[in-house]
Amino acid sequence: MHHFHLLKAARVKKETNDSVNIAFEIPQNLRHEFAFKQGQYLNLRFVFGDEDLRRSYSIVNAPSEGNTELEILVKHLEGGKVSTILNNELKEGDQVEASAPMGHFYTHYHPSNEKTYIGLAAGSGISPVLSNLKEALYQEPKSKAYLFFSNKSLNDIIFKKEIDDLTEKFEERLKVIYLLSREKHFEDELFEGRISAEKLSQLFERFPEIPVQESTYFICGPSEMIKDISGYLKNDKKVPSLQIMYEYYAAPDDDENAEMSDEFKAIPNIESMVTLIIDDDEYSFHLNSKKKSILDQALHDKLPVPFACKGGVCCTCKAQVMEGEVFMEKN
């Protein structure tokens, strides 16, 4: 079970017009539980009456920077209850419920490695990418890193000061390329527009020193960008899949736009008995195959099940098929 603890906001800093950087203080007695790896995320919990809201936010800092604080970035979403509170109402000293860091968006570093790491990020997708690149630079003195970072305008570049400071600190080993999609700021048209397979191909031509096939990639941004870039790297540049890591901030297809799978449409209405074992306690309920998901029904019955995103992204809740077949409603 994922236990939630109250963490105090040590710093609340407006990063851009629509995003805030929050540093949570980790007390001594929780530092073991909240030990983290680069690229992981925090689950935050907010309870409004009967409404239990969970949100996952990537950790921005790197383990090499210390374990006394965890930093996250929260981008304001129109109509988003939690993001509005964190952007507009949270103050230094306020407390927020959080559970221990989770996630698998990272690789392992070793001081003897001499590798190249490529970060490809758009907007708030910079958070886990930056965490990974920082840890690589701190842990592997012979390795190099490139960051290709797309934003709408110069003022929208998240963590620009920190990134620029890092380029000075690691000037021989870190190269940062900003791309702007809605502002003509650079003389070179190559740095206009979003990151795409076509744009990445042009960037590789501009920076021929990048060992494309041998590099390790961290990608985070809109789902279409991730699919486009990862497909290009695997299929066109023959980069091994194990060297391409990506993190979705939302399910790959928006629920309202995704087509219901043919396999799921063909499933008849089936009434099943579901049994959950949670911390050695057993719970059972009836479930119709065409209605609520197991998680939604469990939450409806107020069962203490662990969850975070409810969108098939965070992997807080997982299932293993032991017998029979499973068809995804939307795949």
Sequence positions of predicted segments:
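Ferredoxin-reductase
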Residues: 2-95, 99, 115, 151-153, ...
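Residue-level detector of beta-strand face positions
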Residues: 23, 43, 273-275, 318-320
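A structural signal for short secondary-structure junctions
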Residues: 210-211, 266-269, 299, 308-313
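Local cysteine-cluster metal-coordination motifs and their immediate loop/turn environment
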Residues: 303-328
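Short beta-alpha connecting loops at secondary-structure transitions
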Residues: 150, 330-331
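FNR/FR-type flavoprotein reductase catalytic core
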Residues: 84-268, 273-275, 282
